[in-house]
């Protein structure tokens, strides 16, 4: 973390230890996140929970642990793990669990404007989008603005 900050990083992403979480090693997961948060010296840390590998109770637990350890964001995934795309329901579950204690970033499977707007309404403030998705979303925004006259 310190090396990345010295190179100019303004935010850090870290993937939680999913195996430890699934094994019930919650203190270990928390200490791991806290070590990165502490090393970041105030630089925001996003904890990536890889929701596609987790059951709902594990998503809630991972989100709680991230907040307790001082993470600035709970991020749904890296985009590298196959599984389920981020859904509005996942964002709602995370937001119901952590409230405003940390920000939420949706990543993986967010493909259209209606999904972005629904996730925003559920408390998500950041979105990890691919180029094709961005283009489609921006085209849809332009169409809706034009339709308003």
Model regions and ranges:
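Conserved anion-binding
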Residues: 1-72
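Surface-exposed amphipathic alpha-helices with a cationic face
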Residues: 33-41, 92-99, 142
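Short catalytic-loop micro-motif centered on adjacent basic/acidic residues
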Residues: 46-49, 75, 104-106, 128
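Catalytic cores of alpha/beta
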Residues: 1-3, 54-65, 92-96, 100-106, ...
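Short acidic, glycine/proline-enriched helix-loop-strand junctions
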Residues: 31, 42-43, 100-103, 145-149
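General structural feature for long, well-ordered alpha-helical segments within catalytic domains
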Residues: 25-32, 58, 62, 70, ...
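Glycine-rich phosphate-binding active-site loops on the catalytic face of alpha/beta enzymes
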Residues: 7-21, 68-84, 109-111, 115, ...
């Amino acid at each position: 973390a310190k090396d990345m900050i010295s190179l100019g990083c303004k935010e850090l992403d870290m993937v939680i230890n999913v195996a430890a979480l699934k094994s019930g090693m919650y203190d270990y997961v928390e200490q791991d996140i806290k070590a990165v948060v502490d090393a970041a010296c105030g630089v925001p840390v996003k904890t990536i929970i890889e929701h596609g590998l987790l059951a709902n109770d594990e998503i809630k637990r991972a989100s709680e642990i991230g907040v307790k350890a001082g993470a600035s964001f709970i991020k749904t995934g890296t985009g590298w793990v196959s599984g389920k795309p981020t859904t509005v329901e996942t964002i709602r579950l995370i937001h119901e669990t952590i409230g405003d204690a940390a920000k939420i970033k949706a990543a993986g499977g967010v493909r259209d404007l209606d999904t972005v707007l629904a996730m925003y309404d559920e408390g998500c403030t950041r979105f990890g989008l691919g180029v094709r998705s961005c283009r489609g979303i921006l085209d849809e925004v332009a169409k809706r603005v034009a339709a308003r006259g």
